[in-house]
Amino acid sequence: MTKKSIYFGTLLLTALAFSSCASDDTATDKTAGKDTPKTGTVFSSETEPATRTSATYTGSGLDFYWTANDKIWVKDDNNIYHQSSEDDIANRIAAVPGSTTTAKAKFWVNGTYTGSTHKVRYTGKNGASDKVTIKASQTQNTPNNAAHIAEDGDFGVADATGSGKYTFTLNHKAAYVTFMPHTTDTYITGAKIKKITMWSGDENDHLAGTFNMDDNGTLSGGTSTTNKVTLTVNDFTIPTVTSYTANAATMVVTPGTYHNVAIEYTLEVPTASGTPITGTLTKLYSSVTFDAGKNTPVKTDLKVKVYPANSYYEWDAAVGQNFWKGYEYGSANPQQPTVNGQKNPTYAPQNWSAESASNPRGYRDDTSAPTPFPEATRSAAHCLNVNEALWYCFKGDPHSDIELWALMGHVYAGGMWFKKQTVIATENSKTIIQLKDKAPDNIDYRLTGWLGGGSQRKINNNVIAGKPSNLNEYFYLPCLGGYYDNGLLRNLGVLGLLHTSTPHPTDPSSAASIFFYFSQVAVDFGNRSGGFQLFNSSNENEYRPF
């Protein structure tokens, strides 16, 4: 095989923009060291703007540069692809103190090239001539420096034209997403970004994987594919306004249109105690198209969901008589405990007592009612019943989550996702009415109940960590804890507790509730006096954080 020196000039940047037609590469020519003669065939990028393999965001698009160890592939006269064996990238970088990139480069490649056109491929630093791997786990260490894309999935193709010397325009064929979150929310002031995760609602989608690539840059035959990509970053800051210099983070993904796309930002949030909280903030998009060779900017104002303080009730208390009625956080006379371990017996409802003239916030008094006691008729009348709670518990595919939210001036992370009732009904060939009438074991526990607090407690330990893929099929409940004797606040940010509409059929002090934490969901009968949340199964998105 003969060696022939072929000059490849002008790597022109194909538009990598916010829209499919606008070119936004505003790079200017950079000064570098003189070209160093080597043996072999020469491929050279000389004219700006040029397509390269490291990227920075300019405010209107991605500007690319060559980095150390970049390689290209060229098809010779025998239709065999050869990888460049040498280049002058290192010399050019060394000629500019402090630089890690260069605007120009020459590559030397073996092979025989006599045609007027030769195919060129770039398959990333770890690619073969016909294989591209877009990684599911990517890392960017410095804001607005996406040098990692060469390692994590960037690829492109070109037609080199000429005679003796060849020029080509390298067309990037990967899709790029540049995240630039900011926040106007004081709850997360000073927070750092740890990672950004994006996934689609269809687990069969191929956001990442290993693919075959043809001369047109079209991908096929994916293996080890996934619908989720995670970009780990190095404690990027979150400014109060969009600033690409502060935190632009670029992800490489497979081009395509994806539905029910979730973008999850994992943050480390400082707290007054000095111990930071790690949690997530998530945005959901119904449909997103990532075009080949284009960059999609994502500019998001990150905010935490703030839950109300007046949503705790004893079981079926009078409508409007929440646990701290008249003394709520934020009221004219705030006496409500706001952090775990605080209590206020002076202003709390009377311990273990039903509603009375002196205890208007107490639970419904059934001491004189005939058994079985009727379902809730007041504040808990629209809550799910015990049978529905058991369907959620055992057929709701619970997923624990660390989504961030706030309550009474403090930030917390923790909650549970459950399948929506309509999804559960469809998957189990039931109607909504049938879910209300009997539990999964075909028993109506509204009539039978059980002895609470013991071995009869219904427990599901099969809880999956992390959000489900298709969030539209699920609803969310936060771990808002509860109030107990003497108004003691417990388990805020740790445990979720919700009343049902179902009293124990014969015990006037007991009612059913559903509760959960990171590894367990349970349904049980317990004391009616607990200050828990109310949940209406016909309004499942009431607590949804985004």
Please give the residue ranges for each predicted region.
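C-terminal, surface-exposed recognition/capping segments
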Residues: A413-F546
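Sec-type signal peptide cleavage vicinity
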Residues: T2-F394, H399-A406, Y412, W417, ...
